[in-house]
Every structure is written in structure tokens, then in C-alpha cells.
UniProtKB/Swiss-Prot annotation:
Belongs to the universal ribosomal protein uL10 family. Keywords: Ribonucleoprotein, Ribosomal protein, RNA-binding, rRNA-binding. This is Large ribosomal subunit protein uL10. Part of the ribosomal stalk of the 50S ribosomal subunit. The N-terminus interacts with L11 and the large rRNA to form the base of the stalk. The C-terminus forms an elongated spine to which L12 dimers bind in a sequential fashion forming a multimeric L10(L12)X complex. Gene3D superfamilies: 3.30.70.1730, 6.10.250.290. GO terms for cellular component: ribonucleoprotein complex; ribosome. Forms part of the ribosomal stalk, playing a central role in the interaction of the ribosome with GTP-bound translation factors.
Length: 172
């Protein structure tokens, strides 16, 4: 990589660190090209991105961002997974790490908070923003459904009572 390319890459990575909802740093030593391509495609499908960067360039790109505290994670062969949704990147990385022992999560960042590996794992267990919205909508709709059921119940019970009397009269 030439000096101009490095500057451009650092600038691009700096913008990524500033705009991302969450960033996950992991070791990928020993992972095959096929495994990395599979990982990248899964991350892309979920709305995130995976990049491999030189540690020195990543540390330079971190300067002046909220995630500057995670610069100590960049040792060895590291990859950077990020997404605008705070849950997507940790969830995809942890799901992929379950089936692939070559991906070892080191930590990450979410806003100004630097995360260790355990924090990334717990973040991955949280529901996504869309799932939370669906649950909230379900909770809002439930009382209305119950009220409609209670209001409709006496009328249906009355109809059953009249039907039972009608059958009783016919039988008699």
C-alpha cells in the first residue's frame, strides 16, 4: 500500500469508527479464505461490514473518535466488524464464532463505551431494534384485544344460553 492509499484508508476507517453503532474486534488467525468470505457475506446480509486492516493504521484511524479506548485490542491478526445498528455486528460475529473456532472475539466499542469480550457476548444476546419494536407493538395491541374479547364475551354467552333454551323447548 502506498502512502496516499494508506491516508485514504485511515480517513475512511476513521469515518467508519465515528458513524458505527458498534464495532467488534476479533482475531481471525487460521481462518480460510472460504470461511472469511462466508463471514463477510453473513455480515453483509445482516447490514454490517467486515474489514481487515493493519493494526497500526487502525490505531491511527481510532484517534479522535469515541472508540479510541479500544486501540489496545489491535494486536496480531485482527479484523474489524461494524454496523450502524448496535446489535447487528456483535450478534453476527458471535453466531459465526460459535461455529468457527478460528474467530476469537477480543472486544469492541459501542459509542464511548469500550467493551471486553464478555460484554460483546452479552450485547449479542439482546434483541435487535426491529424485534424490540415488534414486542412493543404486541404489548400495545394486547390490551385492546383483551378488551374486545371481554366486551364480546357476554353477547356470545347470551346467544349460547338462548340456543340452549331453544333446544330444550324443542326437546320438550
Amino acid at each position: 500500500m502506498e502512502r496516499a492509499e494508506k491516508r485514504e484508508f485511515v480517513t475512511e476507517l476513521n469515518e467508519v469508527f465515528k458513524a458505527s453503532g458498534s464495532v467488534v474486534v476479533a482475531h481471525y488467525a487460521g481462518a480460510t479464505v472460504a470461511q472469511m468470505n462466508d463471514f463477510r457475506s453473513k455480515m453483509r446480509a445482516a447490514g454490517g461490514t467486515v474489514k481487515v486492516a493493519k493494526n497500526r493504521l487502525a490505531k491511527i484511524a481510532l484517534q479522535g473518535t469515541e472508540a479510541e479506548g479500544m486501540s489496545n485490542l489491535f494486536k496480531g491478526q485482527t479484523l474489524i466488524a461494524y454496523s450502524t445498528d448496535p446489535i447487528t455486528a456483535p450478534k453476527v460475529v458471535m453466531d459465526f464464532a460459535k461455529t468457527n473456532d478460528k474467530i476469537i472475539v477480543l472486544g469492541g466499542a459501542m459509542g464511548t463505551t469500550t467493551l471486553n469480550a464478555d460484554a460483546v457476548k452479552s450485547l449479542a444476546t439482546l434483541p435487535s431494534l426491529d424485534e424490540l419494536r415488534a414486542k412493543l407493538l404486541g404489548m400495545i395491541q394486547t390490551p385492546a384485544t383483551r378488551i374486545a374479547g371481554v366486551v364480546a364475551a357476554p353477547a356470545s354467552q347470551l346467544a349460547r344460553v338462548f340456543a340452549a333454551y331453544a333446544k330444550k323447548d324443542e326437546a320438550a
